[in-house]
């Protein structure tokens, strides 16, 4: 996608944390907010009493003259419409793979759904050419005793025609590699942006900040 630019010259990018329910998306976002000092404003969350995201979590992070609006999606299967709404206009994706072996099918379901919705953006017809929207994977919960091997995750990505996807081994509750993954995704946003500028693409002005609209009853 293409970022927008505010009147003061600030570039605005949108990052989305994707993945199955309870995979660590909100925990990772909370770590960025509470521990890393990158947040500008409050962490907004729409969740149920158990901590499951009902629509999205949102955080604004600012680095120099670049702003990143970071969203998580609701991971439960019934919230497909909400995920599709949050996904619109995304500049980069971070897929949180739940390393718990018992969650294998949920990971596969979530990845397949993402490719159905956004495959034309995150896949490239030529592996030598990066896709329009960068995607990285956080293999989360690496502190658990029974975890899926990284090689198996790589096999899934290869079968999905994403063999060059970068994988970070993370533990969201302790922050292990969370900042590294976030910074990498943010950097990829900026790099893609300047690649597009070289090709002559224009940056649209930023509209007033809006959030995804919740579905009606």
Task: Tell me what each language-model feature is.
Residues 70-72, 94-98, 136-140, 169:
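Conserved beta-strand segments of the P-loop GTPase G domain that flank and frequently precede/overlap
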Residues 1-46:
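Conserved G1/Walker A P-loop phosphate-binding module
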Residues 22, 76-77, 100-102, 141-145, ...:
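Conserved nucleotide-binding/hydrolysis micro-motifs of P-loop NTPases
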Residues 44-82:
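Switch I (G2) and immediately adjacent beta-strands of P-loop GTPase domains
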Residues 89-111, 119, 129-130, 142-147:
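Conserved Switch II/interswitch segment of TRAFAC-class P-loop GTPases
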Residues 143-199:
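Canonical P-loop GTPase G-domain recognition
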């Amino acid at each position: 996608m293409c970022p927008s630019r505010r009147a003061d010259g600030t570039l605005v990018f949108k990052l989305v944390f994707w993945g199955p329910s309870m995979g660590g998306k909100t925990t990772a976002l909370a770590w960025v907010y509470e521990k890393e000092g990158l947040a500008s404003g409050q962490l907004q969350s729409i969740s149920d009493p158990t901590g499951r995201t009902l629509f999205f979590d949102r955080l604004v992070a600012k680095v120099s003259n670049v702003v990143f609006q970071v969203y998580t999606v609701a991971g439960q299967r019934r919230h497909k419409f909400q995920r599709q709404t949050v996904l619109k206009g995304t500049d980069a994706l971070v897929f949180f793979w739940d390393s718990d072996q018992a969650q294998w099918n949920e990971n596969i379901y979530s990845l397949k759904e993402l490719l159905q919705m956004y495959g034309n953006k995150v896949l490239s017809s030529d592996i030598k050419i990066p896709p329009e929207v960068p995607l990285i994977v956080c293999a989360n919960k690496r502190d658990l005793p029974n975890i899926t091997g990284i090689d198996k995750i790589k096999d899934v990505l290869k079968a999905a025609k994403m063999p060059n996807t970068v994988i970070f081994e993370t533990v969201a509750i302790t922050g292990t590699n969370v900042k590294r993954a976030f910074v990498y995704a943010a950097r990829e946003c900026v790099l893609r942006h300047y690649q597009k500028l070289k090709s002559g693409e224009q940056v649209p002005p930023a509209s007033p900040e809006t959030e995804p609209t919740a579905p009606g009853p």
